[in-house]
């Protein structure tokens, strides 16, 4: 039997990959989304969840950046 899944290859640094693995393990998106963990900088994920992943990564980046205040 063959299972076909539509996926997207993501290339990222190891720190971002750890964040993606954390989201996958904690079922933050409601289900597992990583199809295959390929190497230290590549993962293959479900195509249907790419937009939501981009939002979550954007939220993480916003939390890690500081706004520039005007004096």
Curated annotation (Swiss-Prot):
Subcellular location: Nucleus; Cytoplasm
Major location (coarse): nucleus
Gene3D superfamilies: TFB5-like
GO cellular component terms attached to this protein's record: cytoplasm; nucleoplasm; transcription factor TFIIH core complex; transcription factor TFIIH holo complex
GO terms for biological process, alphabetical: nucleotide-excision repair, preincision complex assembly; transcription by RNA polymerase II; transcription initiation at RNA polymerase II promoter
S-S bonds: none
Protein keywords: Cytoplasm, DNA damage, DNA repair, Nucleus, Transcription, Transcription regulation
Functional description taken from the UniProt entry: Component of the general transcription and DNA repair factor IIH (TFIIH) core complex, which is involved in general and transcription-coupled nucleotide excision repair (NER) of damaged DNA and, when complexed to CAK, in RNA transcription by RNA polymerase II. In NER, TFIIH acts by opening DNA around the lesion to allow the excision of the damaged oligonucleotide and its replacement by a new DNA fragment. In transcription, TFIIH has an essential role in transcription initiation.
Similarity section: Belongs to the TFB5 family.
Assembly and interaction partners: Component of the 7-subunit TFIIH core complex composed of XPB/ERCC3, XPD/ERCC2, GTF2H1, GTF2H2, GTF2H3, GTF2H4 and GTF2H5, which is active in NER. The core complex associates with the 3-subunit CDK-activating kinase (CAK) module composed of CCNH/cyclin H, CDK7 and MNAT1 to form the 10-subunit holoenzyme (holo-TFIIH) active in transcription.
Protein name: General transcription factor IIH subunit 5
Organism: Gallus gallus (Chicken)
């Amino acid at each position: 039997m063959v299972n076909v899944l539509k996926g997207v290859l993501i290339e990222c640094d190891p720190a971002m990959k750890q964040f993606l693995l954390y989201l996958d393990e904690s079922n933050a998106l409601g289900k597992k989304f990583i199809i295959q963990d390929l190497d230290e900088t590549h993962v293959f994920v479900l195509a249907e969840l790419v937009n939501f992943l981009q939002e979550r990564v954007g939220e993480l980046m916003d939390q890690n950046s500081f706004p520039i205040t005007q004096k």
